[in-house]
Amino acid sequence: MRTTYMAKPNEVERKWYVVDAEGQTLGRLASEVASILRGKHKPTYTPHVDTGDHVIIINAEKIHLTGNKLQDKIYYRHSGHPGGLKETRAADMRANKPEKMLELAIKGMLPKNTLGRKQGMKLHVYAGSEHKHQAQKPEVYELRG
């Protein structure tokens, strides 16, 4: 009888991928990138082991939001002090911190535990078309759809 393959942390082969966010829809891009970060695109995927790859996202400032989300979507954060609730519209977020907008969308799709935090550290987002990871020889990842 065969047993199910379980990846071991020291056996995991990690690749680096570059994803161009220009013209891509925020949620559709985020769900594919989250899947790569978790390692679900590999046949060696194991739920309790970090089998994911590194993902570099460029052109985050050119991400697309459907409908009226650019004006209507609001990001909330709290300082921890009474009356410290802050809100930012999606249009302002895309203009000032486009990297943060993508990071929030992708990290929201990862597990809320230590493994998810570790997987989130393999995400590298840049507003422009330049990134500083040429030494890792990243491959261009073509998104489905």
UniProtKB/Swiss-Prot annotation:
Record field: transmembrane: none
Function: This protein is one of the early assembly proteins of the 50S ribosomal subunit, although it is not seen to bind rRNA by itself. It is important during the early stages of 50S assembly.
Name of this protein: Large ribosomal subunit protein uL13
Record bears the keyword Transcription regulation: no
GO biological process: negative regulation of translation; translation
Organism per entry: Halalkalibacterium halodurans (strain ATCC BAA-125 / DSM 18197 / FERM 7344 / JCM 9153 / C-125)
HAMAP family the UniProt entry points to: Ribosomal_uL13 (MF_01366)
Any Pfam family the entry gives: Ribosomal_L13
Family to which this protein belongs: Belongs to the universal ribosomal protein uL13 family.
Keyword Ribonucleoprotein: yes
UniProt-recorded Gene Ontology molecular function terms: mRNA binding; structural constituent of ribosome
UniProt keyword annotations, A-Z: Ribonucleoprotein, Ribosomal protein
Source species, domain of life: Bacteria
Stored CDD domains: Ribosomal_L13
Subunit structure: Part of the 50S ribosomal subunit.
GO cellular component: cytosolic large ribosomal subunit
Record lineage: Bacteria, Bacillati, Bacillota, Bacilli, Bacillales
